[in-house]
Regions:
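Bacterial Sec-dependent N-terminal signal peptides
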Residues: 1-25, 208
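Exposed beta-strand and adjacent loop surfaces of beta-rich binding modules
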Residues: 16, 35, 58
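Short, aromatic- and cysteine-enriched interfacial helices/patches
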Residues: 17, 133-136, 179
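Short, solvent-exposed mixed-charge patches
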Residues: 20, 214-215
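Short N-terminal segments immediately surrounding and downstream of signal-peptide cleavage
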Residues: 21-39
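Aromatic-patch recognition
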Residues: 46-168
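A short, solvent-exposed beta-edge/loop patch
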Residues: 145-200, 204-209, 214
Length: 215
């Protein structure tokens, strides 16, 4: 009986570990590709399923054949609208606009580590026109070797805010307090502790920012 329970415990542990690793191995910001309105700076608009690759650090879309492709000219894109959310093309980072003025953006990056060794596979990179999307073009993604080297274990959030005429960033309590003179840091440290602010929660941090700029 004890032996059976022992094997049962090992089996449950292995199943849980497999499920966890499967989830961790996703390299994308969203669990699934999202319907997106892609607005270019020259006024052109397209729709396509879009996601953000946290390892390769760029947005990807699916063409009509469900092939994942990178945007050919990402610098020409003004905004990506996913539902009621707006994203910008950052420098190797996904940037969500929560508020335009005063600025409050959330920057998403992947926390990665080396993947377990396994046989890599190859692929080719080529540029192709997506006719079904009325001119939306992309570059085919090379698969395998780069993806096999690292996996995403978590998603980091960095907050980019407008403070006066400057733009500053913070990601935890310590870096947030540095936005203020030392005399004010004690007060805001107490506020954070009393309200149990979780810097992983965009809603809580946004409310904290709004309170801080109103005083």
């Amino acid at each position: 009986m004890r032996l059976i329970l022992c094997w049962l415990g090992i089996w449950i542990f292995c199943v849980g570990l497999f499920a966890q690793n499967t989830k961790d191995n996703s390299s994308f910001l969203f669990d699934e590709f999202q319907d997106c309105l892609i607005v270019y700076k020259d006024g052109r608009q397209f729709t396509a399923p879009v996601n953000y690759d946290l390892i390769k650090k760029h947005y990807v879309f699916k063409d009509p054949e469900q092939q994942e492709k990178e945007f050919s000219d990402p610098e020409l894109i003004a905004v990506l609208r996913i539902g009621n959310r707006s994203f910008l093309i950052g420098k190797q980072e996904a940037v969500e606009v929560i508020q335009a003025q005063p600025k409050f953006n959330v920057i998403y990056t992947g926390d990665t580590r080396r993947a377990p060794k396994k046989i890599s596979y190859g692929g080719t990179t080529q540029t192709a026109s997506v006719d079904n999307y009325s001119g939306l073009t992309g570059t085919g993604l090379s698969g395998g070797i780069q993806d096999a080297q690292r996996i995403v274990t978590g998603i980091n959030k960095t907050y980019e805010v407008g403070v006066g005429k400057k733009t500053k960033r913070f990601y935890n309590k310590k870096s947030f307090l540095k936005l203020f003179p030392k005399k004010q840091q004690v007060r805001w440290n107490r506020y954070i502790e009393e309200n149990k602010i979780d810097f992983g929660s965009v809603d809580q941090v946004f409310k904290l920012f709004q309170v801080s700029i109103s005083h």
